[in-house]
Design a protein with these regions (language model features):
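Catalytic or ion-coupling anion/metal-binding cores of large enzyme and transporter domains
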Residues: 1-139, 144-238
Length: 238
């Protein structure tokens, strides 16, 4: 019966999200409410630099690629890896996929390592217990620099400064940007095409871009027309 808690009797004192910035995106959030004791001990408890850690990126091009390769020994995924997924934002994956909360490979799970740092331009379920860095904006399909991150890159996460930075030089940034080619989008339905045209990034709520033009509709433009109204004298026979 004691499900809804008040402020004085909370489940967790410091919970919620952190809003992050970085040198390869303008905005992201981290679900700090689900940081486990295991995760905190492994990544956030360095006495010299608490809440700061550096991991090597392992990059996946969407959920299909993740499921296909996560258990490959060639990736050499270990507890110092950060799993990165892209192509999952509102443009790359209309609706934005709930896929950022990736599990470690089976061999790490068997060792008791139940969570690795993860990062991506998609979403995750509200019930997920993964402390992912998600909603990376702009997404890779919109030209965001998440698209130039490579497997093996070192990524520095500093929760004290609310920053996530890839540790490459400015010249390397420019080189990768100049060589990058964004893959053409594959619209499987007209609704996907429409969504990609009018929906913004997750940092803005993935809302319709022209939404601000349609406030106080009745005052500005009158009551919208009813699509089934013929007048009081008419009745429908079904």
């Amino acid at each position: 019966t004691d499900v809804i808690k008040n402020f004085e009797n909370n489940l967790t004192e410091h919970a919620g999200f952190l809003v992050l910035k970085g040198n390869f995106f303008s905005s992201a959030i981290m679900k700090t409410s689900v940081i486990s004791d295991e995760f905190k001990k492994r990544y956030l408890s360095n006495p010299k630099n608490p809440n700061l850690f550096i991991c090597k990126a392992v990059v996946f091009e969407g959920p299909e690629d993740y499921h296909k390769r996560i258990n490959s020994k060639k990736l050499n995924v270990n507890e110092n890896s950060i799993l990165v997924i892209r192509g999952c934002g509102p443009i790359g994956y209309p609706g934005s996929a709930e896929v950022v909360n990736m599990q470690p490979p089976d061999r790490l799970l068997k060792k008791g390592i139940n969570a690795l740092p993860t990062l991506g331009d998609g979403r995750q379920s509200g019930t997920s217990e993964s402390p992912s860095i998600l909603h990376v904006s702009p997404e890779s399909a919109a030209g965001g620099d998440l698209g130039i991150i490579k497997t093996g890159d070192k990524i520095k996460i500093d929760l004290n400064k609310r920053r996530v930075d890839v540790l490459i030089s400015n010249s390397e940034f420019k080189k990768r940007r100049s060589k990058r080619k964004i893959k053409p989008l594959n619209n499987q339905t007209p609704w996907q095409e429409l969504s990609r045209l009018i929906v913004g990034q997750l940092e803005d709520g993935a809302c319709i871009k022209t939404r601000s033009m349609y406030t106080n509709i009745v005052e500005k433009k009158g009551t919208p027309r009813h699509s089934h109204w013929l007048g009081e004298k008419y009745w429908y026979i079904i």
